[in-house]
A protein has these predicted regions:
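Predominantly cytoplasmic-facing regulatory/coupling regions of multi-pass membrane proteins
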Residues: 1-81, 138-240, 266-305
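Mid-bilayer segments of alpha-helical transmembrane spans in multi-pass integral membrane proteins
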Residues: 84-94, 122-134
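Re-entrant/interfacial helical elements at transmembrane boundaries that shape
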Residues: 96-106, 245-260, 274
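Transmembrane alpha-helix termini and helix-breaking/packing motifs in multi-pass membrane transporters
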Residues: 131-142, 261
Length: 305
């Protein structure tokens, strides 16, 4: 009962943010977000999406292998594409990750470790975004927000995101807390693990920022990249909050606030976030092909299990 109530609450909060933006800024920002996208932006999204997906899948491979699980890069890329697509079209924005975690764990004969590999991989990505957000926003005070407020916002976002991930019951299994801690040390903190994982996470973040820049230019923003990057980092950080509808909600709200605070206009921030959301969905579309082509294989696997 509590799980069901929390699931509905998350969706309602995300929907509430979008409704509030709709009432405050009108429909034009949403309409413009669809109208300004051209073939050039679509191809850019597909290219950037390929790069970020490969980088993220590679990160997953590193974590999984450190935990003793087999995972080839080609298979990881296909599974990651499918997860991104499901995350984009299904509520909550994490159901695709749940599927790839459970499927990989079952195939490797260790469901708990398969799930932990995905959780740790996602934590690594979020950690880099949080660190980048703190570093960039403190280094570039031209955003217009007081430094104390920035720290409070980032701190709250970080605490909520980490608490949400840590509280997830599917991160646990019957092996107990000691095995989970051991996997964290091996998968993320080991000397031969964290440098590569950090580098891949930083490169993937750069790709997401590049897609945001494409979105900003599509809506006609003439602001320099140095001014846009802090706004984009904070918007990306908001996507980690577990109160969204397929990634929509907090990202658009934060983008409207920070673009407005920077003097670029809340409407431009909202339109940029909408364009980014559409382009991110376009970038995940290869995952739909993976889902269709691999469906018969998955059905046979489920019968075998």
């Amino acid at each position: 009962m509590k799980k069901s109530m929390w699931a509905w609450a998350k969706l309602l909060i995300g929907a509430g943010i979008l409704v509030a933006l709709f009432l405050q800024l009108g429909t034009q920002s949403f309409v413009d977000g669809l109208r300004v996208i051209t073939v050039g932006e679509i191809f850019a999204a597909l290219g950037i999406g390929l790069a970020t997906t490969v980088l993220s899948a590679w990160r997953w491979c590193l974590v999984a292998r450190r935990l003793g699980l087999r995972l080839s890069l080609p298979r990881a890329v296909l599974d990651y594409y499918r997860a991104l697509f499901l995350n984009s079209v299904l509520p909550a924005g994490v159901l695709g990750d749940v599927q790839r975690a459970v499927e990989h764990g079952r195939q490797e004969g260790d469901l708990g470790r398969g799930v932990r590999a995905v959780v740790l991989e996602r934590i690594a990505g979020q950690a880099v975004i949080i660190v980048a957000g703190v570093a960039v926003l403190l280094a570039v005070p031209s955003l217009g927000l007081p430094r104390d407020i920035i720290l409070v916002i980032l701190g709250v976002l970080a605490v909520i995101a980490v608490a949400f991930v840590a509280a997830k019951r599917w991160v646990r299994d019957n092996t107990g807390l000691s095995r989970t801690i051991a996997d964290i040390r091996a998968g993320l903190l080991a000397r031969n693990a964290w440098p590569g994982i950090t580098l891949l996470s930083a490169a993937a973040l750069a790709g997401h920022i590049a897609l945001f820049v494409v979105a900003a230019h599509a809506v006609g923003s003439t602001a320099p990249i140095a001014q846009l990057v802090p706004l984009m980092v904070l918007s990306l950080l908001a996507m980690g909050l577990p109160v969204n509808i397929g990634g929509w909600g907090p990202r658009e709200g934060v983008a409207a606030v920070v673009f407005g605070a920077a003097g670029l206009g809340a409407a431009q921030g909202l339109t940029t976030a909408v364009v980014y959301g559409v382009l991110a969905l376009v970038a995940s579309l290869p995952g739909a092909g993976v889902l269709i082509l691999r469906a018969p294989v998955l059905r046979r696997l489920e019968k075998a299990l």
